[in-house]
Amino acid sequence: MPHEPLNSYRSGPDERGHFGIFGGRFVAETLMPLILDLEKHYALARVDPAFKAELDGLLTHYVGRPSPLYYAERLTEHVRAIAAHAGGRGGAKVYFKREELNHTGAHKINNVLGQILLARRMGKTRIIAETGAGQHGVATATACARFGLECVIYMGAVDVERQKPNVFRMNLLGAKVVPVQSGARTLKDAMNEALRDWVTNVTDTFYCIGTAAGPHPYPAMVRDFQCVIGEETRTQMLEREGRLPDSLFACIGGGSNAIGLFHPFLDEPNVEIYGVEAAGFGLDKQHAASLAGGRPGVLHGNRTYLLMDADGQIEEGHSISAGLDYPGIGPEHAWLKETGRVTYLSARDDEALDAFQLCAKLEGIIPALEPAHALAKVVEVAPSKPRDHLLVVNISGRGDKDIFTVADYLAPVG
């Protein structure tokens, strides 16, 4: 990575893993040697041309990168019709960054391949991971199958039930899926179990975290592996339009797809950046919008915004999307909110469902429920932008995994 200026938004974290007051590494004493060893190996790998060449080769020939930057013509017509109905003449030109076309159907594989190559360098033979929607679990199981590594996936029992297609895929790929019965039996609880496993099996096990959270160096490492999204978008938009986009949109659970798109543009002051959290039933009801409805605290090894009750106990997040119900957020997003560089919005379940159907009917693309949250805000914001405004939304995953969930929600009651 080129040297960043001191006033850069891209220079974090510091040597202790902090983005301002966020981040860090709050871990058990038994884990600290593993964390420091991981940090050392990652620092060496990221400047090793052989590591980059191997990862780039896999991204090209195994994942199918670069993913297309697609002009969503009919969605653009739709937002311009909304603008015209309101008496305006605007409506942004909407592009999709099509991460759903990657092998395994989401952005998760970008990060997993980087971490698995690192695990092999470290001599680890057993890989563990947590998963919510199942996309990170599938990506991890896929990479482990590719390299002949033992794979154990921790998944909340509720998510096992609502993401059956992905559970079958993981089993088919040779992974052992462990349903987690503690707590709310969702992603937070799966992450707790994975951390317990890691402490118990320190010698042969590598923990492949799926989002830009956790103890340092994970937030920075996951971000770096996902930055291929934003770097490609930058190149592709310059080729298509001769200039950078005017705005970026991405959904946020832990926030890896978003930071991967955003990071290469953070020092471009004319590029507006929007992250979209899950507002669930509404911000005054059950939701998973940590930035909108949470406050700073420590969870899973880092300080960030968390959903907490008055006593500081972690509350359970709710979203129709299994990939967005984490009750925290990556620490770099917490810092970007504090600095004001990124604007964080939220979309309710019903808004995401509407956008899910709209995208399918207008573009012939069935998005995952996660990026449907971002699409909901695109439909809201884009009509107010001028016609020459170039907007990119990250379609971070495909919707195959969600069709049964959506069918249940849309089924007439009684």
Curated annotation (Swiss-Prot):
Name listed for the protein in its UniProt record: Tryptophan synthase beta chain
Catalytic activity: (1S,2R)-1-C-(indol-3-yl)glycerol 3-phosphate + L-serine = D-glyceraldehyde 3-phosphate + L-tryptophan + H2O
Pathway where this protein functions: Amino-acid biosynthesis; L-tryptophan biosynthesis; L-tryptophan from chorismate: step 5/5
Gene3D superfamilies (UniProt xref): 3.40.50.1100
Domain of life, per lineage: Bacteria
PANTHER family tied to this protein: TRYPTOPHAN SYNTHASE, TRYPTOPHAN SYNTHASE-RELATED
Family: Belongs to the TrpB family.
Quaternary structure and partners: Tetramer of two alpha and two beta chains.
Keyword Lyase found: yes
Cofactor: pyridoxal 5'-phosphate
Species for this entry: Beijerinckia indica subsp. indica (strain ATCC 9039 / DSM 1715 / NCIMB 8712)
Annotated Pfam families: PALP
EC numbers on record: 4.2.1.20
Sites of N6-(pyridoxal phosphate)lysine modification: 108
Keyword entries, A-Z: Amino-acid biosynthesis, Aromatic amino acid biosynthesis, Lyase, Pyridoxal phosphate, Tryptophan biosynthesis
The protein's role, per its UniProt record: The beta subunit is responsible for the synthesis of L-tryptophan from indole and L-serine.
Keyword Amino-acid biosynthesis tagged: yes
HAMAP family: Trp_synth_beta (MF_00133)
Assigned GO CC terms: cytoplasm
